Amino acid sequence: MIPSFGIGRQAPQDRVDEWIAAVAPGRSFVDIGGIGEQSGNERCSWAQRCGAVNVAMADILPLNDDLWEYFLGTMRARGVTNIDVRPGVDVDDPGLATKLGRFDIVQATGLLYHLPNPVHSLLNLRRVVGEYLITNTVVIPDLVENAEGRIAFPAASALFLPALRGRERAVLRRHYLDRFSVDLDFHAPMGDGAMMPYVIKGEPSPWPYWWFFTKSAFERALEMLEMRVLDRYTWQDHAHFVFLRRN
């Protein structure tokens, strides 16, 4: 059966797929971080179907991780071949450009809110972008109101989740549980003993949620890349996607 979503799909599943289809023919392509969540958001197979060449999947995880095994196994099962594999790629690595090289199209979504220094991460990503960058982050609404209370976020806001406590935490936890079945007590833990702690062996972890931005604050950060915004879209006032081109 031909899947309508995920690896091997034959039609665009969202706006990001449409962006890729518009520029993929004859261009190199890398998807950074696309093996997560059962590879449901991977873009390699779609980019290849749309005519991209030198297509690669990169991720911070080592090749022996279960997520790589699932990704590669599903690729084989669905007849997708000739995808280059780049394990152990950290977007915060000062040597990223040397390790990964440059691709015409860089797709890096689902990453920035997991990183402790997202502006640094964006600037580092720019070093591997030949022409186009597709990225996103989780955004906070201007106003959140529910049974736990009410919080307004000024346009320039960036929310540091390790510091989230008290009423603000209660309001936002209820918001994300009700709308997306996401529990901030798991993804943005408060104390010791968490399954995804913020610091592991003295180093920041890339697994919990670190930062949420307002849409305007995120786009202001993107301006630092000195790239031109071609298009944008927001999914359910929650995930903000931006399609950029180098000047």
Predicted regions and their residues:
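S-adenosyl-L-methionine-dependent methyltransferase catalytic module, highlighting the catalytic core
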Residues: 116-246
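Conserved alpha-helix/loop element of class I SAM-dependent methyltransferases that forms part
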Residues: 6-27, 42, 46
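S-adenosyl-L-methionine
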Residues: 69-98
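A short SAM/SAH-binding and catalytic strip from SAM-dependent methyltransferases
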Residues: 103-117
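Conserved SAM-binding motif I beta-strand of class I
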Residues: 54-62
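Conserved SAM-binding loop of SAM-dependent methyltransferases across substrates and taxa
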Residues: 36-52
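Short amphipathic alpha-helix with an adjacent loop that forms part of the alpha/beta core around
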Residues: 19-22, 93-101
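Conserved class I S-adenosyl-L-methionine
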Residues: 26-38
